Design a protein with these regions (language model features):
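Amphipathic alpha-helical linker/stalk segments
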Residues: 69-99, 106
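Amphipathic alpha-helical packing segments from all-alpha helical-bundle domains
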Residues: 93, 112-113, 126-153, 163, ...
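C-terminal peripheral helix-coil segments that are non-catalytic and often amphipathic
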Residues: 1-12, 142, 146, 150, ...
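Hydrophobic/aromatic residues within well-ordered alpha-helical segments
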Residues: 64, 71, 75, 95, ...
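Key DNA-contact positions within bacterial/archaeal DNA-binding proteins
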Residues: 55
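Basic, helix-initiating cap at the start of DNA-binding domains
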Residues: 1-52, 65-66
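Amphipathic alpha-helical segments used for helix-helix packing
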Residues: 106-134, 177-180
Length: 213
């Protein structure tokens, strides 16, 4: 007698599959947001492309805004840390290394496209755009803070130094990328941007360190 194969009843996926559903939903959302823009993408489109039911989508994300935030947060959280330097670096060297890594990621075509998407949502949904921008900015800030703390030579105010460094290094190149300047030109000037920022911070006394503890 042949065993009768039970049909899936749908509903919530097993725990070992839940992460895969989330990944597919965010992959689909990213693809559609970049192809169509935020306004012309619906939650139904995302669920369909992901091969998931609308119930699965809404069980995880309240609305399209929440999906958009999750897409950006995943990009920030999965951004690789700068490769470890081959030799120990002083504070200035660590910041130089981190700054080059931040700009390398920021100038990638998909990153620039995501930034343009955020700008495009700012008129209709300024609160959403502000929140998404905060997520991205804080992600870069955390990486710089980790870089600063990864050594015995510590500045008087690591948090302030990290914030000023991110603003000086990232914001100008971000604006130029959004305005359509060729990525190759921006990449070619990335090192000079980092050196300019370090020079300003040094002149302001923010790179001065105390004795190792």
């Amino acid at each position: 007698m042949k065993a009768v194969k039970q049909k899936s009843k749908g509903g919530r996926p097993p725990l070992d599959k839940a992460g895969d559903v989330e990944r597919r939903l965010l992959d689909a959302a990213l693809q559609l947001f970049l192809e169509r823009g935020f306004e012309d993408t619906s939650c139904e489109d995302i669920a369909r492309l992901a091969g998931a039911g609308k119930a699965s989508l809404y069980a995880r994300y309240a609305n399209k805004d929440a999906i958009f935030e999750a897409v950006v947060r995943r990009d920030v959280d999965t951004q690789p840390l700068p490769a470890a330097a081959s030799v120990p670096l002083d504070l200035e060297g660590r910041l130089r290394h981190a700054g080059q890594g931040i700009l390398a990621h920021a100038l990638q075509p998909q990153t620039v496209a995501m930034m343009r998407l955020v700008v495009g949502t700012s008129i209709r949904a300024p609160a959403l755009a502000a929140e998404v921008n905060r997520i991205g900015w804080e992600g870069g800030l955390r990486r710089v803070q980790m870089t600063i703390l990864d050594g015995p030579d510590q500045p008087a105010n690591p948090s302030a130094l990290a914030s000023h460094f991110v603003d000086l290094v990232f914001a100008p190149h971000q604006l130029r990328a959004l305005l359509g300047e060729h990525p190759d030109d921006l990449i070619a000037t990335a090192s000079a941007r980092v050196e300019w920022a370090l020079a300003l911070l040094k002149d302001a006394g923010q790179l001065e360190t105390g004795s190792p503890q």
